């Protein structure tokens, strides 16, 4: 089959094609355009184009006139009258034939009187043009106002048809001149231009916005952009004719450009992102070619790979599968548009603010810059800032208490993240996980309407977090590894490449891929999963966090910094800037003999400590929840300083916390999780060790009957008594002194951190109300600490497994230890009643409190099951309190085991009150079957179903 010539190919698509072509092409070419042809805009536009074509194509005016006359008479003729076509001259055969365009035009004329014709706007805004949305032509347009987009008319006006030979010749000459020895001058000029642009005040994130400079810079930019566009066109033509030569020349030119004009992109209304701001990120998230190489991330990457004129394998940045930097740089993947409607990448003229620092005027929290390109298609920029506020929101104005149930303790300073000019430099994975945690409970309208919005957004943020983290494999990403990477990873006959072990990790120092930010990201993922119904799956994330923390040696203090003599003109206040803006991920280094010369800020040191102690506490807490041995040992952190007071930490007063003890604490020292809950977890670790030693299949019985057992139990009991005394001293210090007005001993506790935790605290509350709230907060902490302390007494003396407790094969209920444990069970119930008084919805520590409420209730269930109507009034009141507490827990943090035990306890309480059902035996058997789901004996996994 021969290929048709160009005139034949063109005439087959002409509105005045010959009869043979029309009959063959009309049915197939107009099927997809039937609905489009019915619209008045389309028909009128095609009518005007056909008239212009007829006027220019005819030889004289008579021909044009006869053509118009013949077309005006065709509305009364049959659509395909072959006899008429044959009798007509061949020169006018196209015009006399009835075609779909004329039919559609006739239909429009018939209905034009009933339907008003909407006036066509001359130009749509950049957003509507890129989104293919109808625009009203206003500035700003209605569409941009409705969706909060930036309405601009900055894109380049393009003309239809081929470029003129004069323009192509000029472009080729410019490209030839640039490739014949002028690359050095181009480098110098471009680098000088970049240096001058970087030093301008409009580009500084800390500086003020200069509108005069902005207008001048934008007005002078189109000419430069036109030159770059011309050079790009010529480079593309040369790449098709001489690939090897053009590739080298283009690579030199683009390297010289250094991403000067395309280092910020604003795709589909998403915020721009500066490449220079990404140089400090860990290598795990950086592009494989580095940020200085502009070959794959240059202006030529904006060419749409689906266009027929673009190269096949070069300059493609739209496909995330072929180039992992596409989502990192904020480009929309081509998969967003269907194959039948290819949307070209936006023209460089769509980005008028290339040289300006991104987000300088719109981003409330610049700390979000690394993650904004990834979340632009998930949540708005304003919502991301609001979610960051939610993450750091405190439920109390007197002392720090995270409002989100999934934020178990503050690892980072709020001021470091929310600083307007010098925020903490964070990995995108950490920021995405923080937004994901906050989105679980945020009441933003974007997440609540429709009801499925929260689940959809949270799922996308979760997938993004895991994708940015690359879990469990801290090695080169896809495309980062060199061709001989696998060969290099065979060391001493062992292949290490598959485990993500890079060469620098085999030395004294760990690479920056295993950073503190990654550990915190694991903690966020594990916390939310632990609070869900998939508790067993959370151990994967906790194990990763514990392993990476141990690898980074977070349980050890870093060596002291090298002292440098302060310059004469250096101010003493520079330390505050260093505290707010620490070096990038320097905390991932610092173990080994070669790290003594690394300077680490005190804030980074405290972040390492708080992260370790949080993992230390959750390790012991989950050992009780899931009936598993400890992972992090006391000897690993024997020389680590205890975490500082949360109020001092948020203020940044490191000098006031200079004198601290080392090692795991056993006394209550503060209102935060680190102050009252961490000491309890230290004691719980000893109880867990005793429990597993007692139940050891070989040595358990001998150890249980040895004097060493009694000594260990006495040691743990002494620690619990020490904690009880410190709890009373803590209550007296923060209630009696505040009541008497003697607040000199703790000057920073009252309102010192209100500047950054509750902005309206000072203006809306009086000193008296803050003192009252501080007293209530202190008593609530004491109530929680008292309850958990009683539960630890029960765990030390009693049985953990509810089925073994109810069956009582060894007659433990007749022993003295049972009487002691029962008294602690009643005391725990009384503390729970006090907790419900100060915290009715149990929202103070819902993540931790559930298991201690459950373990403290087993003995009361045993008493209700055995004694029934003979139970004492104190036991009945304790059972009622436990039922109310479980109902409150179900409302705050709904989990299956709490709902199940509430039903079991409610059934037992009904029997105590004399309401014994007819199937009493079946009720007892059903309770045991339900409790058998949660076993702490043998190979039982506790709450991890």
UniProtKB/Swiss-Prot annotation:
Q: Tell me, what is an example of a GO biological process annotation in this record?
A: DNA-templated transcription
Question: Which ranges are annotated Basic and acidic residues under compositional bias?
Answer: 73-84, 565-581
Q: Which GO terms describe its cellular component?
A: nucleus
**Biased composition range(s): Polar residues:** 176-188
Matching entries from Gene3D superfamilies are given as:
Zn(2)-C6 fungal-type DNA-binding domain
- Cellular localization per UniProt: Nucleus
Q: Per its record, how is this protein called by name?
A: Xylanolytic transcriptional activator xlnR
**Superkingdom, taxonomy of origin:** Eukaryota
Q: Where is the composition biased (Low complexity)?
A: 1-23
Organism name: Aspergillus niger
